[in-house]
Amino acid sequence: MTENPDQKEKLINNMELLPNMVNEAIRLISPVIYMRRTTTEETQVGEQKIGPQEKVVLYYGAANRDPDIFTNPDKFDIERENAKKHLAFGYGRHLCLGKHMANMQLAEVYKQILERFPDMHQSDEWKVVPNNFTHSISEMPVTFKPE
């Protein structure tokens, strides 16, 4: 939100956008970077044939920024109509059981931060945990005025 002050202001003025903002944030920065799956039968993706029992890697960031699905996929837009179509929590029988809990927790955290510290902004670069499987922030310095 601090990188997109116009979107932050829009959200502060209309908190009904909060659930969609959470989906849009997750779409842009998926908590899981990739997942490996094993095919059960022969299939084809584009021109690539994939045999049964082959390992495939699914990169969520690529899917969540697919320009055929998301217009201006690199833009953070809390009013994006299809933000909920992200695949950050998987899909179908592989859907993460914690998806709804994570969405509720993120919505509540953002609500509390925006209500208590509306002027909060990032004061330095954020640091990511060195990990090739999950995308986690280890440090994000912020500045705000106390209540």
What are the roles of these predicted feature ranges?
Residues 1-147:
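Cytochrome P450
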